[in-house]
Amino acid sequence: MAWNTNLRWRLPLTCLLLQVVMVILFGVFVRYDFEADAHWWSERTHKNLSDVENEFYYRYPSFQDVHVMVFVGFGFLMTFLQRYGFSAVGFNFLLAAFGIQWALLMQGWFHFLQGRYIVVGVENLINADFCVASVCVAFGAVLGKVSPIQLLIMTFFQVTLFAVNEFILLNLLKVKDAGGSMTIHTFGAYFGLTVTRILYRRNLEQSKERQNSVYQSDLFAMIGTLFLWMYWPSFNSAISYHGDSQHRAAINTYCSLAACVLTSVAISSALHKKGKLDMVHIQNATLAGGVAVGTAAEMMLMPYGALIIGFVCGIISTLGFVYLTPFLESRLHIQDTCGINNLHGIPGIIGGIVGAVTAASASLEVYGKEGLVHSFDFQGFKGDWTARTQGKFQIYGLLVTLAMALMGGIIVGLILRLPFWGQPSDENCFEDAVYWEMPEGNSTVYIPEDPTFKPSGPSVPSVPMVSPLPMASSVPLVP
């Protein structure tokens, strides 16, 4: 089926409408947190505080790292498609910019409401980035097959569902999920996989040649991998309690990521008959350890435990890219462009299970009495909880997340199937030229619904033949 992909009025109107709504809602509901307000001066004097004690100085370095991961790491990781680099980075930029605004509102209404106002500080910015990271994960499943309008619609609904799921887990079930193995990765992955299943394209084979990478596109994607890999310790520790919890989360993530690289390389080489490495595995499976250690990151997992998690996830993720992704596409009709099930889905579930087991096995000998109370908030509502109770609720949180992702993905997928969102036809998927003005001679797309459009020439422009210069040895020497 061919759809009209001319977005001249639809995209501008959608973007402007959403932004105007954001301006109005921010004007009505959003104010600065007291540490960002000018009244901080009187508060500081009254409580004898120093500017250095402002939350900004504790949290902003982590916020910077998380921000880079969302906009640079995820964006460039998805540039592996040979003709979809503009869209991978550009649409990631678009959905993230809208998503952080909507996330500040949705999370604010659930977590940061004081009176009738949402108070915004640096911690809100980190949480909004976490929410958008989940959207970026889901984007990987539908990459190349949807229009920017569909992505904005998906972002709107996913951020809403993310905030609801996060509230249920963190506020009602009292789950610990510092690095978001459940709330971010599991939810984002299975929401995205459900959406892409609903949007299944029977004739996607017509765009199969564009679904491959080339040398340069893989190199750009590797840049995204390195940014994600380097900053993941900040991601998993960004909102942990100051002091030992945050310190522990960074160490555990660091160790898990390091182990994951070695096992990913080992399995990738072992699965090739000539022992060669597959760049897809190195770009993605090497990050699975950071996903899986997220829930238990601030727990007393021990460095060797983090290494074991990374070791196992490197193996499972690489095997998933080789065997599971083709199976899901051929048997279940799940067209997972980026293989997010192997990088975020399965490692996220592993992370949820590891978090439950680690919480259930917590003891006074390992944590100490005060450390146990502080690490799991065993006070107030949870005053009579035991470690086993915490572990049980961790599992409940994982199950709720999966249910929310699957049900939400079905509903949003059905909305995105409507024919007026400007989605590309099956033969024009994974092609920048559908939505972007391309440099001369860099488009092979054909849009039959636009009679004025003429497909351009070959993707590699012809170069006039030039006689080669003579070799140095053949040039006569002047005596």
Curated annotation (Swiss-Prot):
Lineage of source species: Eukaryota, Metazoa, Chordata, Craniata, Vertebrata
Catalyzed reactions: NH4(+)(in) = NH4(+)(out); methylamine(out) = methylamine(in); CO2(out) = CO2(in)
PANTHER family: AMMONIUM TRANSPORTER, AMMONIUM TRANSPORTER RH TYPE C
Protein name: Ammonium transporter Rh type C
Record bears the keyword Endoplasmic reticulum: no
InterPro entries registered for this protein in UniProt: Ammonium/urea_transptr (IPR029020), NH4_transpt_AmtB-like_dom (IPR024041), RhesusRHD (IPR002229)
Cytoplasmic topological intervals: 1-9, 82-85, 145-148, 201-218, 272-281, 325-345, 416-479
Spans traversing the lipid bilayer: 10-30, 61-81, 86-106, 124-144, 149-169, 178-200, 219-239, 251-271, 282-302, 304-324, 346-366, 395-415
Residues linked to a glycan: 48
One of the protein's GO biological processes: ammonium transmembrane transport
Function of the molecule: Ammonium transporter involved in the maintenance of acid-base homeostasis. Transports ammonium and its related derivative methylammonium across the plasma membrane of epithelial cells likely contributing to renal transepithelial ammonia transport and ammonia metabolism. Postulated to primarily mediate an electroneutral bidirectional transport of NH3 ammonia species according to a mechanism that implies interaction of an NH4(+) ion with acidic residues of the pore entry followed by dissociation of NH4(+) into NH3 and H(+).
Keyword annotations from UniProtKB, A to Z: Ammonia transport, Cell membrane, Glycoprotein, Membrane, Transmembrane, Transmembrane helix, Transport
Post-translational modification: N-glycosylated.
Assembly description: Homotrimer.
Main location group: membrane
Topology class, membrane: Multi-pass membrane protein
Family the entry assigns: Belongs to the ammonium transporter (TC 2.A.49) family. Rh subfamily.
